[in-house]
Amino acid sequence: IIYKNEIDNYYNLKKSGIINETEIFIQNYIKPVEVIIVGAVHIAQYLIEFLKDLNFDVTVIDPREYFITKQKFQNIKIINKQPEEFFKKIKTSSNTALITLTHDPKIDEPALKHALKQKFFYIGALGSKKTHENRCRRLKEDGFNDEEINSIHGPIGIKLGGKSAPEI
């Protein structure tokens, strides 16, 4: 293709436009940002409202049936499975973000491993600094390198000094 470099440039920059001095118009169709939240905890309810306001596609995964209720989580995808089961059945992309909220390594870490392997654009994990240190140590023991592990934002959140779900 004569204009391969120009087409690649538009694609990589995720923009649309006319290639200089031609009549070729490039239109990029960008998949919406998808945010996968692991953990149907009280914090998730507030986070979901924020993400929906940004027009992100939101999916909540939690294998614990008593946390997942349609009353708590309306108008979003709710998956009552272990994260590794869910990730086997869906396709994710570089437009996918992961936020883990359960504090349970048996639930959070399989999702984190998948996100690291698939190079999600954002990976965040809730928990204390000590919890995050332990999480990183276990991931390193499982073969992930420092660069991969350092791509996990953790502990996530902004220190406002509060303890309520919206503040967390």
Language-model segment annotations:
Residues I76-Q82:
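Conserved SAM-binding strand-loop segment of SAM-dependent methyltransferases
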Residues F56, F120, F144:
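Short phosphate-binding/catalytic loops that engage adenosine nucleotides
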Residues L126-I168:
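Adenosine-phosphate binding glycine-rich loop
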Residues I1-P63, F67-I76, S93-T96, T131, ...:
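Segments forming oxygen-rich coordination pockets for charged ligands
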Residues I61, A97, T102, K113-R138:
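ADP-ribose/adenylate-binding Rossmann-like module
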Residues N75, K106-K113:
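Cytosolic regulatory regions of ion transport systems
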Residues T59, I79, H153:
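General small-molecule cofactor/ligand-binding pocket signal
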Residues E84-S94:
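Short amphipathic alpha-helix with an adjacent loop that forms part of the alpha/beta core around
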